[in-house]
Amino acid sequence: MKIVLITVDNEEITLKNIISAVLTQTAEAACDSLSIKFIDNIKAVEIEKVLAYKDDELIFNGYCDCQKSTVDEKGFQTYIYARSSACLLVDNDAFAYTYNCPSALSLFQAYAKDLGFKFKLPNVYTLKKYEVTSGASLFGAINSLVSMISGNGIRINASNEIIMLEVSKDILNLNSYPILSVKSIINRSEPISAVHYKKEFSSNYDCHTYSKSAKDLGFSRNRYVNLISLASWQRNYKISKMIKDSFKNYKCLEITINGYCSSELYQRFNYESLIGKFDDYLLLEKIYSYDKNGEKCKLVLGKNIDVKEVNYVD
């Protein structure tokens, strides 16, 4: 791993004595994170940006959040924690506004273009009204619209491109990777079996969405929500997301491999060993670690489940 620091005075420093570096990418988090420990003496310079490369490919492009330098009997050491460039969209509030027939492109132009991001989303739009409320972040304003229309969130890659986070069409086989360890986890404490809700003109929770998959698996976990204030297209998205999100930690694999995994988040995988057979698992988190002992990558995967939603009204 090659790491380049850029100071507030635009001076570039390529680290030569890295003790450890950990790059974390998570589908649920807007920002990737990179933590670094090194013994290069950078003195009192203030770091603004951090770049990380793997085999000359840019894998992290972000901003320094925290910088700590220590001198003791062991010598000089610095710790840096950085978040990817998506932090610019996360840390800034969007101005509140009600859009009529907005598209992802129109929100990008309003909220992200001037910050240097590039638009790489498909043609996502709605013919309805969309409200960006006070306190929403720039990231949240764009992500919510794209998610409600397409069912997929957005992601910012290392090239500052806003792309769609969607499930891969192909399925790779993890058995071809140099695997160090495998852990299988089944968590039955979270999946929701049904959502009961109120919509406009409802006085009771007389609208229902249940998961046929949850029923078949023996789950009985109900939620009651008041959705009177939401438009139908926003309401349907919220209910569907509640059920789907509840299954994310149901069946998981944690696999540590030797070296680096270049696969993107939401890549689908199959895996089979003495621990069991695992078909169609999504890559939800990737933790790449580098130190004097070499490099390894921890992959956290979740079962790709069709929750089979069924709707009915009393």
Where are the model-predicted features located?
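Short acidic, glycine-rich loop/turn motifs
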Residues: 5-10, 52-55, 199-202, 271-275
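Short, charged, solvent-exposed linker or helix-capping segments at domain edges/interfaces
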Residues: 90-96, 174-177, 310-314
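An acidic/polar, Gly/Ser/Thr-rich interaction patch typically located in mid-to-C-terminal regions
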Residues: 15-44, 182-314
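Surface-exposed cap/loop segments at beta↔alpha junctions
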Residues: 38-118
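Short beta-strand-centered interaction patches in the first periplasmic/extracellular domains
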Residues: 75-89, 121-192
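Polar, S/T/G-rich
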Residues: 101-115, 135-148, 198
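Polar/acidic, low-complexity leader/linker segments enriched in S/T/G and N/D
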Residues: 1-17
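Short beta-strand and beta-hairpin "edge-sheet" elements
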Residues: 51-80, 155-156, 270-300
